[in-house]
């Protein structure tokens, strides 16, 4: 990983019970310094039914990351996300601006540890894109494209 990268971990609307654990795991695995912030009010986003357009969250994430002095941003949101070409997405990353967003609405389980592991895996996947990692054909790799 490039050195001196700092990540803003932005929770939209709520902080999950395992936010500290997520921060710790990401920091250890990716060797990043991480700051946590909460944005209680969602920014406006285009809608398709109950879903929200994933890319609409990246500009506000960029603004907040820059104001916090962070080079990378990762948003966590409960709302279901989409991009025009797909029915839904678990997350979206923009390597150009080093921002990503992950939705956990499709990861929810009655077992909190299962939910956490799913969220952590998707966060690492999207952050991998920020470091220009491509999709992988190996289904055991975190960069595997899940819709295959």
What are these model-derived regions, one by one?
Residues 4-14:
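Fold-level signature of zinc-dependent metallopeptidase catalytic domains
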Residues 10-12, 105-107, 146-148:
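Short strand-loop junctions, especially beta-strand C-caps/beta-turns
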Residues 15-123, 130, 134:
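Metzincin-family zinc-dependent endopeptidase catalytic domain
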Residues 134-148:
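Post-HEXXH active-site segment of zinc metalloproteases
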């Amino acid at each position: 990983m490039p050195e001196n990268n700092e990540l803003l971990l932005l929770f939209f609307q709520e902080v999950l019970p395992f936010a500290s654990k997520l921060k710790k795991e990401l920091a250890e695995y990716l060797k990043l310094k991480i700051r946590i912030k909460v944005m209680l009010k969602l920014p406006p986003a285009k809608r398709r039914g109950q879903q929200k357009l994933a890319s609409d969250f990246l500009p506000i994430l960029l603004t907040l990351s820059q104001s916090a002095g962070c080079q990378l941003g990762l948003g966590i949101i409960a709302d279901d996300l989409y991009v025009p070409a797909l029915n839904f997405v678990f997350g979206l990353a923009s390597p150009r601006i080093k921002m990503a967003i992950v939705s956990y609405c499709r990861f929810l389980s009655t077992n909190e540890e299962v939910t956490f592991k799913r969220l952590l895996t998707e966060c690492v996947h999207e952050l991998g894109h920020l470091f220009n990692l491509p999709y992988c054909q190996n289904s055991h790799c975190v960069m595997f494209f899940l819709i295959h």
